[in-house]
Amino acid sequence: MFIKVLGSAAGGGFPQWNCNCANCQGLRNGTIQASARTQSSIIVSDNGKEWVLCNASPDISQQIAHTPELNKPGVLRGTSIGGIILTDSQIDHTTGLLSLREGCPHQVWCTPEVHEDLSTGFPVFTMLRHWNGGLVHHPIAPQQPFTVDACPDLQFTAVPIASNAPPYSPYRDRPLPGHNVALFIEYRRNGQTLFYAPGLGEPDEALLPWLQKADCLLIDGTVWQDDELQAAGVGRNTGRDMGHLALSDEHGMMALLASLPAKRKILIHINNTNPILNELSPQRQALKQQGIEVSWDGMAITLQDTAC
C-alpha cells in the first residue's frame, strides 16, 4: 500500500494566514525551526498509479500541483484521483471539492450523515450538480467494508469515532455515529493495515480493537494541551470542544499511542499553535523519545510485509 500526505496541518494551515502566535510568527521570521504545512489530506493507492483521495482540503489545488503522482500523463485533461472518501463534513476536509469541479463527475464515498450536512448546511453536493454531474454519492455504513474501483486491492472500513459535527450541522454538539469516522484500510495482497483518524475526540472500547490491529497509525495530533488555544490567546475553545484529544493529557493521545503495538505511529492534523511544530521544542523531543513521528506535507509511506 502506498500512502502520501498531501497536507499535515489542521484547519487554517501553518502558518495560519491571520495568526501571529509564537509558532506562526516564528516561522515567518525564521526564529524557529519548522516547515509550512497545508490543511489535512492524504492519498492512498494499491499500485502507485491510481489513487484514492481521503478528504479534500481547501488547499487541494496547491497540494495537487506539488504531487506529480496525481498528474495523469497521456491525456489532455485528467487526474489519477480515482475516488474520494470523506471522513466527516468539516470545512477543512470538504471545501476542496469545489476546486475539483472541472473534473466532475467525481465518485465520493461518505456516510449518509456527512452527505446530509453537505447537501444542507454546506451544500457542496447541491452546488456541484451544475458541473457535469457533480458528485456521485456512494453511501458507506460504519464497520461495513467497501472498495473503490480505482484501487480494488484496498479494502476500506469506516469506524465511528467520538468527535463533533461542524457548526453548520443541525447535529452540532449532538453528533450521530456517522458524522465522524476513521478509516481502517487493508492492503489485501499482504494484509498490511493503516488506521487513519485526523480527528479523534475520545477513544472508546469499541475503537480499541481497530487501533490495536493496525500496522501503521496516522492519527490526530491537533493540540498538545487541551487549553492550548486559550493559553495562546487565539481562541476560547478547548481541544475537546473541537473534537480533538490533546497529546499531553494524562489520558491523552501520547498515552494511548504508548499502549498500542503499531510499527509506526504518525501524527497528522496539527494545529498552528501546537509546540511540536517547532522541531527543536521539548515537546517534539518528547515525541521522538516515544517513537512518535510528525507527518509533513509530501511524506510518503509504504506498507510492506515486514514493516511500514
From Swiss-Prot:
UniProt record, GO biological process: pyrroloquinoline quinone biosynthetic process
Keywords: PQQ biosynthesis, Transport
Keyword check for Cell membrane: no
Any single Pfam family the record assigns to this protein: Lactamase_B_2
InterPro entries, A to Z: Metallo-B-lactamas, PQQ_synth_PqqB, RibonucZ/Hydroxyglut_hydro
Keyword Transport appears in the UniProt entry: yes
Pathway(s) of this molecule: Cofactor biosynthesis; pyrroloquinoline quinone biosynthesis
Function: May be involved in the transport of PQQ or its precursor to the periplasm.
Annotated family: Belongs to the PqqB family.
PANTHER family: COENZYME PQQ SYNTHESIS PROTEIN B, HYDROLASE C777.06C-RELATED-RELATED
Protein name: Coenzyme PQQ synthesis protein B
The species this protein was found in: Klebsiella pneumoniae (strain 342)
Lineage of the organism: Bacteria, Pseudomonadati, Pseudomonadota, Gammaproteobacteria, Enterobacterales
